Amino acid sequence: MPDTIAAIATASAAAAVGIVRLSGAETRCVLAALFTPVDGRSAAELPPRRMTYGTVRDAEGRTLDHALAVVFSAGHSYTGEESAELHCHGSPVVLQEVLRAAFAAGARQARAGEFTERAFLNGKMDLTEAEAVIDLIDAETAEAARNAAAQVDGALRRPLEQVYDALLGLTSRFYAVVDYPDEDIEDLTLAETERTLTESLSLIHI
């Protein structure tokens, strides 16, 4: 995934604050082309996870907004890549102009769900957690939101990992006994198999 993506991360309605998000290897270069910190530093030198105030400009040097920028180092961001956010005034027109400036600086439009896709591909979340992000966004009740948030936090992943480990151990023992009958390997009993399967089913509430 060599390209750097950009998108508006907040709703398309007017609000006090709107966010433009960047992710990819060239994030700092794109950010440096857009954003000038108030202290005159290059945006490429910003420390991670610290808000910095400055000016957002387009390729012609015209001021688009005064905003806060924050960068996240690869491995410590939502996507697992070098990432950044520009917290601008929440006018849809302003956000679109900032996004166009990001494209002019080398980013491309992110596909729907691509930030979460990259998080999944980079090992920042598994498939259950990635799907839960969608459920959390689409939640229409407080209970649905709580359930989705728990899954994002690994509530489904952890028991599935336990089930996977238990079944892997079971099948490994089975194949060892079958493939090496002359070795001193303890037979896998029916009772042990039933106990492992019952415990596994209870973990996933089937």
Segments the model singles out, each with a brief description of its role:
Residues I204-I206:
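Conserved small/polar residues in nucleotide/adenosyl-binding loops
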Residues L160-E199:
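Charged, amphipathic alpha-helical linker segments immediately N-terminal to NTP-binding catalytic cores
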Residues I134, A150-G169:
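Extended, Lys/Glu-rich alpha-helical coiled-coil stalks
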Residues M1-R146, A150, G154:
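A glycine-rich (often HGG/GG-containing) alpha/beta subdomain
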